[in-house]
Each structure stands twice: as structure tokens, then as C-alpha cells.
Regions:
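C-terminal catalytic lobe of FAD-dependent flavoproteins
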Residues: 29, 34-85, 90-296, 301-312
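Core beta-strand elements of the Rossmann-like FAD/NAD(P) dinucleotide-binding domain
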Residues: 8-18
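Glycine-rich, N-terminal phosphate-binding loop of Rossmann-like dinucleotide-binding domains
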Residues: 23-24
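Short beta-strand segments that buttress and anchor functional surface loops
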Residues: 1-6
């Protein structure tokens, strides 16, 4: 298989005994355009949009309310002083990479929340919106909310290397999906080992007894020079890998350039080195939510710095 880097134009050739097509919303594109194969199965895209607003209640409670159309809407505390509200559930037929929340969806979420709370949200309260597409296995049902959230495998062994196509799936069950997918490939890789993820923590989750509060106290003791908000940010986002982010720093100056809020150069370098961040947008919007805590000028200054720092090989 030959690949081309869309940023650099670099091409590479890969050879494999099997291909697992877990491209999500692009799964059928890979089947037809990359593997030059066919499948009777398909996915349908369902758009889910969210809005972020200033937190408008006291306390740490989260809420789940039912709208007039029977859909449930969550209202969660988010990033300290903000609230995350979602989601919509709308059939989507555009390009997955172009998905965005539209005004109708934003109004839908605001109206749903305002049915339950005394303090009414307004359009100008929306700080940010984002949207994603769920690649749901197309089981022929008309209502997007009724489409199965389960996943389906399709193993094609008719061509060269076997092609395992994954239709559907979601982030909360990705480990189970991966495990069962490997079971389907056992006859292709007879030396394959057994299952191992049942009690294996996620990266950064190597916390004794899963006791986060004790872990957080230890972090504060380990880095007494660090502001509590920064300790909280690192602890929640990176867990036991906080030490890799801090990288031996003994004071705030040791974390490198400060971009505003709890955003320091050491975190940027970690994300590029360990979490495949390639662009300033990757860091501000995807790996972190720093964009919510920086001014427009601070965001622009970071983008300019990153673009000239030559951190990405």
C-alpha cells in the first residue's frame, strides 16, 4: 500500500499480511478507494453538536434533561468555570471533515436547557461550538436515534492481504472492539498472544488503587512551586505521566515559555513528542482546551511561536 502525506507530499510504501480498516466515517472510502474492494455493509453518519457556555449554576452537579422530542441533553461542568451542553442527533450526508454545528442546532440546545433552568441562556453566551460525526452501522432504520450504536466486522479474504472492515463503534467500547477484532484475525496470526487489556490502565492511569485524590495530593507535594490550577490541569489530563510533561523542571521558569493561563512550553513539547501533535490547532483545540482560557491575542501569539519553533520533524 502506498501512502502520501497530505502536508509534505512524502510517499511511503507499506507491506502487511493484513489490513484493519478502522477509519470510522471514512471506512467505505478506504474500502473503495484504497483497498479497491467492495462490501455490502455501510455506515450512516449522524452529527452530534455541542456548545460551551459560562457555567450558570453553583456546585459541581451535572444535569441530564429530556427535550420535547424525547432526546436527552447533558449539561456538565467543564473546564472549571464553563459548561458543556450536548448533543444533537442529526443525519449527516456531507464530508466528515467539514462537519460543524449550525445555528439551528445551537438554538435547539439553548431552547432545551432554557425549558429547565430559571437563568436563561442567550445566543451570545455561547463561547464555542463543535461537532462530530458518529459512524453508525447502517441497519436500515430511519430514525438516527434508533440506529444501533454497536459495531459490525466484515472480513474480506478474497483479494491479497485480508481486509478487516469495522463498521460503527464508539470511544467508550474501543478496547472491547479491538479485542474482538483481533479474535477475528487469530487464524491469520496463529502466534498471536492472549487478551491483556482487562486490567491494564490507560496511558497515565497507573494510579495506585485508582485513588485520584491521594494521587493529586502527592502531585501537590511533589511540585510545591506549581500553582494548584496547573497541578490540577496536569493531573487530570496526563495523570501519572505528569512527570514526563514537567521533565525535571524545578520551578515555573523551568517549564519554558508561558503562553497564558496554565499553558507552558513544556506541555507543548510533550504533546509533540508523545501525542502526535502536528499543529498549533492540534494543541489548542484537540489535545487540550487551552483555547478557552487564552485571549485572542494570546492564541495568536502561540500560533506564531509554534509555527516558527520547528518542533515537528
Amino acid at each position: 500500500m502506498e501512502t502520501r502525506n497530505s502536508d509534505t507530499g512524502e510517499t511511503r510504501t507499506f507491506r502487511a499480511r493484513c489490513i484493519v480498516n478502522c477509519a470510522g466515517p471514512w471506512v467505505t472510502d478506504v474500502i473503495h478507494n484504497v483497498a479497491a474492494s467492495t462490501s455490502s455493509r455501510n455506515v450512516r453518519l449522524v452529527k452530534g453538536s455541542h456548545i460551551i457556555v459560562p457555567k450558570f449554576w453553583s456546585g459541581a452537579n451535572a444535569y441530564l434533561v429530556q427535550n420535547h422530542d424525547k432526546r436527552v441533553i447533558f449539561i456538565n461542568p467543564y473546564e472549571g468555570d464553563k459548561a458543556l451542553i450536548g448533543t444533537t442527533d442529526i443525519a449527516y450526508e456531507g464530508r466528515a471533515e467539514d462537519v460543524a454545528a449550525d445555528e439551528k442546532e445551537i438554538d435547539y440546545l439553548i431552547t432545551a436547557v432554557n425549558r429547565y433552568f430559571k437563568e436563561k441562556l442567550r445566543r451570545e453566551d455561547v463561547l464555542h461550538s463543535f461537532s462530530g460525526v458518529r459512524p453508525l452501522f447502517d441497519d436500515g432504520k430511519g430514525n438516527p436515534s434508533a440506529v444501533t450504536r454497536d459495531y459490525v466486522f466484515d472480513l474480506d479474504e478474497t483479494g491479497g492481504a485480508p481486509l478487516l472492515n469495522v463498521f460503527g463503534g464508539k470511544i467508550t467500547t474501543f478496547r472491547e472492539l479491538a479485542e474482538r477484532g483481533m479474535h477475528r484475525l487469530k487464524h491469520i496470526f496463529p502466534q498471536m498472544g492472549g487478551d491483556w487489556t482487562h486490567d491494564a490502565p490507560l496511558p497515565g492511569g497507573e494510579i495506585a488503587n485508582a485513588d485520584y485524590e491521594t494521587f493529586a495530593n502527592t502531585l501537590r507535594d511533589t511540585y510545591p512551586w506549581m500553582p494548584r490550577t496547573l497541578v490540577h490541569h496536569y493531573g487530570r489530563l496526563y495523570g501519572a505521566r505528569t512527570k514526563d510533561v514537567v521533565a525535571g523542571a524545578q520551578n515555573l521558569e523551568g517549564l519554558g515559555r508561558h503562553f497564558g493561563g496554565d499553558f507552558h512550553e513544556a506541555e507543548v513539547r510533550y504533546l509533540v513528542a508523545r501525542e502526535w501533535a502536528k499543529t498549533a490547532e492540534d494543541i489548542l483545540y484537540r489535545r487540550t482546551k487551552h483555547y478557552l482560557h487564552l485571549t485572542e491575542a494570546e492564541r495568536a501569539a502561540f500560533v506564531e511561536w509554534f509555527d516558527n519553533a520547528n518542533l515537528v520533524a
